[in-house]
Design a protein with these regions (language model features):
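Short, conserved secondary-structure transition motifs
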Residues: 30-34
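S-adenosyl-L-methionine-dependent DNA methyltransferase catalytic core
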Residues: 13-26, 36-207
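Charged helix-capping and loop-helix junction motifs
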Residues: 6-12
Length: 207
């Protein structure tokens, strides 16, 4: 069901030893308002009943997230060379790729990773411009597709920034899960007047 099952089993075993009930599920960020297909296993240890947030009916597409950016060519744009375009064409033909791996404005993006943001030509996240040229994603575009707000600042050089974006759990997905945890904890606190729970509840007030 999951890769690295041994690691999941270890986490579950240790959480159970600490007295937690365990709920885990593979969530796709696209079901929670993130304009990207991104499956991640989320494990929650709790002392009360817990349910993951309900999936949202409407999915956000690429154009809704970066429509104002994806056909622009800022000074720091990095365009694919002729040899890269030729390599991609051969790669997609050899791998029987029916749909080019460019970003499609009318659908969610495929999973963003460190590798396809900053590295491999064949798997590169890229935008096809109206004049036929293709360029790599900008940091701002990649961040939006991960649901980061425009004001969020990443540190380091270009590769380091892409690594931070590619490795991240989408903030919007994390927020939706945090809200569900908060609701579960509120229910627990109403059932238990223990001072320990009241103190911990203050940590959730900012959510």
């Amino acid at each position: 069901m999951y890769s690295h099952n041994w690691y999941l089993e270890l986490i579950l075993k240790d959480l159970k030893k600490l007295g937690y009930n365990i709920t885990f599920e593979c969530l796709n960020a696209v079901d929670y308002g993130v304009p990207q297909n991104r499956e991640r296993l989320i494990v929650v240890g709790h002392k009360n009943n817990f349910s993951f947030p309900r999936k949202e009916i409407k999915r956000v597409c690429v154009e809704e997230a970066i429509g104002d950016l994806m056909y622009t060519t800022p000074e720091d744009s990095k365009f694919l060379t002729k040899s890269q375009d030729e390599y991609i064409a051969k790669y997609e033909k050899a791998s029987c790729c029916k749909v080019p791996r460019d970003l499609h404005p009318d659908r969610p993006a495929r999973t963003l990773t460190c590798r396809n943001l900053a590295g491999a030509t064949s798997d590169m996240q890229r935008v096809k411009l109206k004049d036929g040229r293709r360029r790599r994603l900008l940091h701002k575009e990649a961040a939006r597709l991960q649901s980061f707000p425009d004001w969020f600042e990443f540190s380091g050089n270009e590769t380091e920034k892409f690594n931070q974006i590619g490795n991240a759990v989408p903030p919007l997905l994390a927020y939706k899960v945090a809200i569900a945890i908060k609701e579960s904890y509120y229910d627990l606190c109403t059932q238990n007047t223990n001072h320990h729970y009241s103190e911990q509840l203050t940590l959730l007030e900012a959510i």
